[in-house]
């Protein structure tokens, strides 16, 4: 990897953040560029998110001087300010269904039970901060990413209006679907339950040629990046699982020439063929599970193997899909930025051009 991201911190620790290695020098960057992304995922913005009040204000600690990146590691930090660790005292010695409590204990023999510690959704703060930088790189190169909520529970969008995405609490491009999603969530909340959904990501301006032909296929890299998000249970590219009931005659994307350029006549593949970008729009979908923290009684056991009926109290999202939209976008941006830098050495002509442009 050329563009590397390390996240650090826990949900109820002093702070969280990220270290980014491999960002080129000379990229215009300030804290506001990153804050815009963090504001899209921060809690407490609607009745459908956790009541935890965090400003999630980012601090750039290194790697930026006089408004531009220096080419050295960029260190970012966001301080936790509204932890309520007492809310988690009742689960210190029991395993919450749907969480990583049991598996962390099995792996490490020890865990931070306060808000899930490292497995908390707050870990994604570092991903989003790094994603903001990756997105700035892509923007400089004419690549744009549009990410939105495709569905919440059984409610799916029936129309697409890009301007509507930031006009509702769910980041849905369909105003009517957003209203129905709100009604569905009200019912979930009344029943002390939660919901999942689907996030769709569309990337335009990507050049053909990104990705490797075997193990590091662009499709595999993107799927790995999205599946590394805690709540993601499945990833689709292009027509996804629908191709299993299709035929080659309808699934294959044909080619034609327009204005002297080779283009595809359709995009069932979602912009990636043979693991390599083909220059058309890249289409991804991430399937998000329902929030596992619910107030309904759930059957579990303690560390001592005693049965227990557990009710999870605290401040939890009835749905995490809207706040995960920018997380999916950030992971896609990080993956593409890295693929771009790796691809710079894919041909000798590109290496010769670099040497030629930098010779005295």
Describe each PLM feature range.
Residues 1-360:
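Generic N-terminal targeting/processing segments that precede catalytic cores or assembly contacts
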């Amino acid at each position: 990897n050329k563009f590397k991201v390390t996240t650090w911190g826990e949900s109820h620790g002093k702070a969280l953040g990220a270290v980014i290695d491999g960002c080129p020098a000379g990229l215009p960057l300030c804290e506001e560029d990153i804050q815009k992304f963090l504001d899209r995922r921060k809690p407490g913005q609607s009745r459908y998110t956790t009541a935890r009040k965090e400003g999630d204000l980012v601090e750039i600690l290194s790697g930026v001087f006089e408004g531009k990146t220096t080419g050295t590691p960029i260190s970012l930090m966001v301080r936790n300010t509204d932890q309520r660790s007492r809310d988690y005292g009742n689960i210190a010695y029991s395993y919450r269904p749907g969480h990583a409590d049991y598996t962390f204990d099995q792996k490490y023999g020890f865990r931070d039970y306060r808000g899930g510690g490292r497995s908390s959704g707050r870990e994604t703060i570092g991903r989003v901060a790094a994603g903001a930088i990756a997105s700035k790189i892509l923007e400089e190169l004419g690549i744009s990413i549009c990410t939105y909520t495709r569905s919440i529970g059984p409610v799916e969008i029936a129309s697409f209006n890009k301007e509507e995405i930031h006009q509702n609490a769910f980041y849905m491009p369909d105003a009517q679907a957003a209203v129905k999603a709100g009604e569905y969530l009200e019912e979930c909340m009344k029943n002390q339950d939660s919901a999942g959904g689907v996030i769709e990501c569309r990337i335009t301006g990507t050049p053909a040629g990104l990705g490797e032909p075997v193990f590091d296929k662009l499709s595999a890299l993107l799927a790995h990046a999205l599946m590394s998000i805690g709540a993601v249970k499945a990833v689709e590219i292009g027509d996804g699982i629908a191709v299993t009931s299709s035929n080659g005659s309808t699934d294959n994307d044909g080619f034609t020439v327009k204005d002297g350029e080779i283009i595809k006549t359709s995009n069932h593949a979602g912009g990636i063929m043979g693991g390599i970008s083909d220059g058309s729009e890249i289409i991804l979908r991430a399937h998000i599970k329902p929030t596992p923290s619910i107030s309904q009684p759930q059957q579990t056991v303690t560390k001592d193997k005693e049965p227990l009926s557990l009710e999870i109290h605290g401040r939890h999202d009835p749905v995490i899909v809207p706040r995960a939209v920018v997380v999916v976008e950030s992971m896609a941006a990080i993956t593409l930025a890295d693929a771009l830098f790796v691809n710079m050495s894919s041909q000798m002509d590109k290496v010769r051009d670099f040497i030629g442009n930098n010779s005295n």
